[in-house]
Amino acid sequence: MELMFAEWEDGERFSFEDSDRFEEDSLCSFISEAESLCQNWRGWRKQSAGPNSPTGGGGGGGSGGTRMRDGLVIPLVELSAKQVAFHIPFEVVEKVYPPVPEQLQLRIAFWSFPENEEDIRLYSCLANGSADEFQRGDQLFRMRAVKDPLQIGFHLSATVVPPQMVPPKGAYNVAVMFDRCRVTSCSCTCGAGAKWCTHVVALCLFRIHNASAVCLRAPVSESLSRLQRDQLQKFAQYLISELPQQILPTAQRLLDELLSSQSTAINTVCGAPDPTAGPSASDQSTWYLDESTLTDNIKKTLHKFCGPSPVVFSDVNSMYLSSTEPPAAAEWACLLRPLRGREPEGVWNLLSIVREMFKRRDSNAAPLLEILTVELAQDLLANPPDLKVEPPPAKGKKNKVSTSRQTWVATNTLTKAAFLLTVLSERPEHHNLAFRVGMFALELQRPPASTKALEVKLAYQESEVATLLKKIPLGPSEMSTVRCRAEELREGTLCDYRPVLPLMLASFIFDVLCAPVVSPTGSRPPSRNWNNEMPGDEELGFEAAVAALGMKTTVSEAEHPLLCEGTRREKGDLALALMITYKDDQARLKKILDKLLDRESQTHKPQTLSSFYSSSRPATASQRSPSKHGGPSAPGALQPLTSGSAGPAQPGSVAGAGPGPTEGFTEKNVPESSPHSPCEGLPPEAALTPRPEGKVPSRLALGSRGGYNGRGWGSPGRPKKKHTGMASIDSSAPETTSDSSPTLSRRPLRGGWAPTSWGRGQDSDSISSSSSDSLGSSSSSGSRRASASGGARAKTVEVGRYKGRRPESHAPHVPNQPSEAAAHFYFELAKTVLIKAGGNSSTSIFTHPSSSGGHQGPHRNLHLCAFEIGLYALGLHNFVSPNWLSRTYSSHVSWITGQAMEIGSAALTILVECWDGHLTPPEVASLADRASRARDSNMVRAAAELALSCLPHAHALNPNEIQRALVQCKEQDNLMLEKACMAVEEAAKGGGVYPEVLFEVAHQWFWLYEQTAGGSSTAREGATSCSASGIRAAGEAGRGLPEGRGGPGTEPVTVAAAAVTAATVVPVISVGSSLYPGPGLGHGHSPGLHPYTALQPHLPCSPQYLTHPAHPAHPMPHMPRPAVFPVASSAYPQGVHPAFLGAQYPYSVTPPSLAATAVSFPVPSMAPITVHPYHTEPGLPLPTSVALSSVHPASTFPAIQGASLPALTTQPSPLVSGGFPPPEEETHSQPVNPHSLHHLHAAYRVGMLALEMLGRRAHNDHPNNFSRSPPYTDDVKWLLGLAAKLGVNYVHQFCVGAAKGVLSPFVLQEIVMETLQRLSPAHAHNHLRAPAFHQLVQRCQQAYMQYIHHRLIHLTPADYDDFVNAIRSARSAFCLTPMGMMQFNDILQNLKRSKQTKELWQRVSLEMTTFSP
């Protein structure tokens, strides 16, 4: 036994405090635990050994006689008393004859108290689990809280009064019994769970250091023996009278027993017990050990070590500063701690205490060791280790080598290799042999371990071998071997795919070939020898290490979770070393991240990654990511696509429609090996030409961001499919097809957003085939063919998603797939990289970092690396969290946004490209809002681009976020505001956008119109009366007639345009393609196409010359058309642009130029005209037939250049009998800017869409249904003025929309009256006969009926005046129609028969008699 502890002491000289910490887990493990849980018995021994320590000198610790002054000789009496007190029980001393003098007995009692405070420390720590109670007791002793100490024989008592407490409530009575320099028992009235409480420690320390201040008395039995009989009787009576309540019952019981005639125990035993005289001679003197408390603490320690208990966080700080580890990470750390840091710490400290007790000859050593043994055995039986191995093979099958046997062979081999390395490295002549042994161990191939514990042990042993190998100096032969292995790693010939990757070997090779001369510890690596190095060693080592980062394992995480966890950690350590070494080399950092984040087999790659690492100068135009707007660039100026990143888009293009394939092309015209980039720039004039009012670009037109979508978890070696460039954005495709990201659909699909379009259980090929990996691509060539009908992709989203498994609860069964453990690991790695860069991962959570240009914080390159790794981890986390789109808070998102604010515009530019699949639209909008307040103009610009990028998901944003995003775009330039407005409008097509938001967008369009047209600022007021009849004609001629959108295979559309004169505006009647089919359309476009018409293959040209058929250029067949075109107001008009149609709503808002209202009137014969293309191209068929009605035979239309519309000299007669008269004023030769006219039409179009949304929402908005001035009143009136500015047809269309969108009868009546005033008050009756006005008036009357019925139910006498005024207004509305008064009289009769009071009816009757319309 002595030999065993001697060996232990030689090898383990220090406690756990001096051993290796494991990522500070032990220091933080009890932050949130209960106070009763033991603290691993830390601090049981003073760190600096002093004269009072057991290992120090042999002196004592007391000041009352223990420390003698130098030069004084200790009396023999004191020496003898001290030895007697330590070795002989006091009972034996009492029986000595002749009796020992009382003074000598007092000295024996004095020396019987322990004199070393380290003993008090040890047993206090042992009882409480830490040295906290001892430290508090020491503070009480130093603050003189011990009062009235008294030692009677071997009993010490005192009163402890803490300074902050008031006696007698805060006074604690403490009693300590001791014998032979050991405390045998202690008690206190504080009620603490452990007997060795703070107050007991304070009293013991007081007795040790101030022994002379303690009143010393002989034992009670000795004092009583000196009393006479009357003195004894007096003593007993006085004692009872002092404490009658406590002592009297006990005293009477004892008297009864003494006076009893029977033989009681008190009468048969000689003598009497004396608590102050110490224990009997037969009792063994031992230190007081609270075994029950100690046993409970050991149980808690073992339970926490074997299975972490759930922790409940009760405050926000705990939620921020701690994150729950996934099971694989927690289990790995739990199994690795005993190997690296002697865990469980508490058990190891208890064993150290046992060793110290044996050293002190403490008799409690054996009982403590017994308690430990029993508890460990019971815990082992209660939680047996998983020692299962693979089942035996079935009969008839070939026996294979047991995995368990191979694992044990591997671990034994590594153990022996580590031992041989330690021994052989001691002598220089054996260094080569040691190197060969170490390399053999690192190159050892093995299968996955049979148990989890062995898996962790093997990984630890490999790291130990690598550490020992790095300490051996290398010669030329060793360096040659290292270079050979590095070359094999770089070429990929060292190992094929295997479960355990040689990452430790790669780490050693990198350390040998590339490690800096001065290591982080300040010393030169022993393996580095400049004499043996060659010029290409560093590059070779770097490429080998990077190749090792890209290696893939062949096992899945579901089968071997800890092996995958260990592989990730080894890759993380290697990548961290690489990034720190090459933190100033941007090209190498890019290679490291490409391999670490697996960008070759996934779509998680930025387009211009290297430009994001600008350290000092602000980002220039070339450094920013593909801009959604900017200056023009030369067409065809492409950067070739590389394997690391996709080529950047050229700024200046609005839609990115270059010579590559566009949306309407058939598959045969687009070869899969097309070399064209999908983002070639447009000519400079593309941004200035007008655009069709019915065409709103999708996400593709706003700039592709397909670069960072980390969703394609494909096979590592599988070649990627060629993509066809731009995705088809035809209206028949589902919503996800038009997006540039496959991860986020623009509207919910079957009850929620689908974050992915593939399942985690799919194989690598099927997964990677549905991902996009090129800039601007939203689907692969295979999926694009399948999505022509619009259902294939939606089916993939729902059916092939999870393969019947719950994604959040299962590890992937396919190798190298995302998992919760992988996401957690990359988050931790990102935080570690940030700390290495000089930043603090926690500061970004609570503070708003400065966004100034001159950033003096962390190393910029490493900071960007940490940001990208964190973003990648967030993508992994979202992949395994199907409900991530509905989250309200995420600490990971807070970290990402905080780092983005610290980094600046570079991080925001990365997010512009890749936030889909990582952040939700509200999170992006919030970040963009925060970044817009920065002082750096580049960051403000990037924030505006980020805000623009989230507007296509406006249905997921609240009005404040959309409003702020619009303001950000408006602060930059008009082009960005225009894109923002189009994005919100496109998002509103599927519903979910508030009408207030759309009205705001309409106002922004009108503001743009004013900026381009130079008109008066009447954005929020009613527009002036419409007298410029040439506006619409010029807009149609300059823009090209609006047309329907068709996908591949759809038939062309034939559009009929009505003639526009200075006097009369005839409603335009648009006929669908089903009535007037035309020839097929050509698909060839030149780079100089109009940026809006280029996206519309079914009408690729704009009419430039409109001539009479007397001078035909290209005669076209003309089909006869009916004279009357009735169009029901509730049905879809034929020829309406599909972008305006909501699939699930019965009403659609379209400009009047696309459809006619239901007016029956004779239409004159229409002569066919010819259309000349805006851009001539040989062989381009022109299927479009435009008919003009009521054109004088002698009149011709001159060439329209898009700048002005000349005066029309013809003045035909009105076409409609009794129809609308011409306006009072005529405007001739009014110049019109087509670009500004586009803005005006867009404002009207969005306003009508807002009116439609208002109708959808109004049915559930009861408080505003019948309000006199609902919030939307001003916006609706403003839209009426805008419609009047455009023309009568637009007013008619507005009336139809207002009848369905407005429910307030008061607002409807105001609209009716204002409409009549704007058109022509003198011909009000003619206007009222129009179907649109008639429908609006009828809706107003119905609303009044509903209002009256509603108010009668909830009417109170206080509301009578308001109700009577409403009746008066209703009568004015009913007077507008011939049958209206009859309906109004019926209402009054119903009101008369109602249950209301007579007073109400009298007031209504009086009002009706005095009514004068």
UniProtKB/Swiss-Prot annotation:
Bias (Basic and acidic residues) ranges: 795-811
Signal peptide feature range: none
UniProt modified residues of type Phosphothreonine: T724
Localization: Cytoplasm, Cytosol
InterPro entries according to UniProt: Znf_SWIM, ZSWIM4-8_C
Disordered: region residues: 45-65, 600-817
Renumbered zinc finger spans (SWIM-type): 172-208
GO cellular component terms, A-Z: Cul2-RING ubiquitin ligase complex; Cul3-RING ubiquitin ligase complex; cytosol
Pathway the protein contributes to: Protein modification; protein ubiquitination
Phosphoserine found at: S36, S48, S53, S738, S741, S745, S852, S1412
Listed Low complexity bias regions: 759-794
Skewed-composition ranges (Gly residues): 55-65, 704-715
A GO MF label: ubiquitin-like ligase-substrate adaptor activity
GO biological process: positive regulation of miRNA catabolic process; proteasome-mediated ubiquitin-dependent protein catabolic process; protein ubiquitination
Keyword Metal-binding: yes
Disulfide bonds: none
Keywords: Cytoplasm, Metal-binding, Phosphoprotein, Ubl conjugation pathway, Zinc, Zinc-finger
Function of the protein: Substrate recognition component of a SCF-like E3 ubiquitin-protein ligase complex that promotes target-directed microRNA degradation (TDMD), a process that mediates degradation of microRNAs (miRNAs). The SCF-like E3 ubiquitin-protein ligase complex acts by catalyzing ubiquitination and subsequent degradation of AGO proteins (AGO1, AGO2, AGO3 and/or AGO4), thereby exposing miRNAs for degradation. Specifically recognizes and binds AGO proteins when they are engaged with a TDMD target.
Subunit architecture: Component of the SCF-like E3 ubiquitin-protein ligase complex which contains CUL3, RBX1, ELOB, ELOC and ZSWIM8. Interacts with DAB1.
Family: Belongs to the ZSWIM8 family.
Entry protein name: Zinc finger SWIM domain-containing protein 8
Source organism of the structure: Bos taurus (Bovine)
